[in-house]
Amino acid sequence: MSARCCAGQLACCCGSAGCALCCGCCPKFRQSRSTRFMYLFYFTLVIIPCCVMMSPSVMKQMTEHIPFFEDFCKGIKAGDTCENLVGYSAVYRVCFGMACFFFVFCVLTFKVNNSKSCRASIHNGFWFFKLLLLGAMCSGAFFIPDQETFLNVWRYVGAVGSFFFICIQLLLIVEFAHKWNKNWTAGTVRNKLWYASLSLALIMYSIAVGGLALMAVFYTQWDDCMDNKILLGVHGGLCVLISLAAISPCVQNRQPHSGLLQPGLISCYVTYLTFSALTSKPEKVVKDEHGKNVTICVPDFGQDFRRDESMVTWLGTLLLVVCISYSCLTSTTRSSSDALQRRYGAPELEVARCCFCFGPDGEDTEEQQNVKEGPRVIYDEKKGTVYSYSYFHFVLLLASLYVMMTLTSWFHYENATIETFFVGSWSIFWVKMASCWMCVLLYLWTLVAPLCCPSRQFSV
C-alpha cells in the first residue's frame, strides 16, 4: 500500500476526506455514495451485537468457549455471565444509543446544501471519531437510571418511529409505481415501449394471482382456516378494486397515464405482504382423531423448514439487514425525498428508459479523469448535495427503531429471542396486515384525490 493511500485513509478516518478503496482495479467511489455506505456499515455494526444479545444460545457458546469471558463480564459489571447484556432490554438500550447518534447528526446537518461547509465535512469524514461517539452512546445507554420507566416509554417511541419508517417505504413504493408507469408511457409512441409495459403488467398480475392461489392451497383447509380464507379473499378483492379504479374513465380523465402497470406492482406487493403475514402468524394446533397435537393452516414443508431454527434465523436476519439498508439508500435519494414532499420534475423532462430507477447520483466531474492513485474518490457534491443529509440520518434513526421493534417481536418482547424470530407472533402479523391495507389506501388516494379536490393540481 502506497504512502499516499495510507495518508488518504488517515485523512478519511481523522479528517474530512472521503473514503474509498486504494487499489487500481477497484472502482472509483463518489463521495455521496461512500458516505452513505459508511453510515450503513456503522448501522450494521450495531445490529450484529443486537442479534447476539437476543440469542441465549450464542451467549452460552461464548461463555463456554471464550477464555476469561466471565472475568471480562465481571470487569465491566455486566453480571457473572454478562446476563445484563442479554435480552430485549439490552437491545432497547443499544438501539437507543444508535438512535441518539443519528438524531444528533440529523440536527447537525439540517439545511446543509453543499459539501464545502464545516457541518458537511463532519458528515462526510472523521469516521474514527464518529465510531467512538457511536460506541460511547450505545454504552452510555446502559447507565440510564429507572430502567422500567425508560423501557416502557422507549417501547412506545419505537413503535411510533417504526410506523413512520413503514409509512415512508409504502409512500415510496406507490411513488415508484407511478413514476415507472409515467416514464414508460413517455416512450410508447416512438419506441413501442408499451409492449414491454403490457407484458410486465401481465407478468405481475400472474405473480399476484398465482401467489394468492398457492396460499389458498397451502394455508387453508377445506373444513378449517376460515380466517386465512377471509384474509385471502379480502386481499384478492382489494387487488381487483385498485385495478378497476386505475382504468376507470373518471380516473383516466384526470390521469391519462394511469394504467395496469401501477396496480400490477401494488398487487404483487400486497401478495408478498399477505404471504409474509401468514408466515408470521402463530401456529394453530388442534387434536386429531387419535388425540395427537397437529398443526394446521400451514404447509407441511413449512413445519420442516422451521425446525432448522439456526438456518432460518440467521438467513432471515441477514435478509432483514439487507432490506433495511436498501430501503435507507433508496428512500434518501434526492428524487425520493422530493417525492415525499410532493415535489416532482416537469413532465416534459422525463426521458423514457428501462432502467430509470438506477440513474447516477450526480454528473461525472473532471476529477474522475484525474484520480490515478491513492483513495479513488470523486467529489460530486461541490455545487450541491446529491441527497438530503438531515433526511438521511432521520431515516436511519427510524430504521434503528424499526430494527429494535422487529428483533424484540414488537409487543411480545418478554419471551422474544432471535431463535424464535420466525415462529410467529400476533404483533408482527397485525403490523404486516396494517402495512398491506395502508399501501392499498395510499394508492387509492393517489387515484381519487384529483377527483375529490379538482381545484388542486396533482402530479405523479
UniProtKB/Swiss-Prot annotation:
Q: What InterPro entries does the entry give?
A: TDE1/TMS (IPR005016)
Give the function comment from the record: Restriction factor required to restrict infectivity of gammaretroviruses: acts by inhibiting an early step of viral infection. Impairs the penetration of the viral particle into the cytoplasm. Non-ATP-dependent, non-specific lipid transporter for phosphatidylserine, phosphatidylcholine, and phosphatidylethanolamine. Functions as a scramblase that flips lipids in both directions across the membrane. Phospholipid scrambling results in gammaretroviral surface exposure of phosphatidylserine and loss of membrane asymmetry, which leads to loss of infectivity.
Q: Tell where it localizes.
A: Cell membrane
Name under which the protein is recorded: Serine incorporator 5
Q: Topological domains (Extracellular): residue ranges?
A: 1-36, 111-124, 178-197, 251-258, 331-390, 449-460
Tissue expression notes: Brain. Expressed at high levels in the white matter and the oligodendroglial cells of the brain. Expressed at low levels in the liver.
Q: Which reaction does it catalyse?
A: a 1,2-diacyl-sn-glycero-3-phospho-L-serine(in) = a 1,2-diacyl-sn-glycero-3-phospho-L-serine(out); a 1,2-diacyl-sn-glycero-3-phosphocholine(in) = a 1,2-diacyl-sn-glycero-3-phosphocholine(out); a 1,2-diacyl-sn-glycero-3-phosphoethanolamine(in) = a 1,2-diacyl-sn-glycero-3-phosphoethanolamine(out)
Topological relation to the membrane, as annotated: Multi-pass membrane protein
Q: Which GO terms describe its biological process?
A: antiviral innate immune response; myelination; phosphatidylserine metabolic process; phospholipid biosynthetic process; plasma membrane phospholipid scrambling; sphingolipid metabolic process
Glycosylated residue positions: N113, N183
Q: Which GO terms describe its molecular function?
A: acetyltransferase activator activity; phospholipid scramblase activity; protein-macromolecule adaptor activity
Induction text: Up-regulated during the differentiation of oligodendrocyte lineage cells and during brain development at the time of myelination. Down-regulated in the hippocampal CA fields and dentate gyrus by seizures.
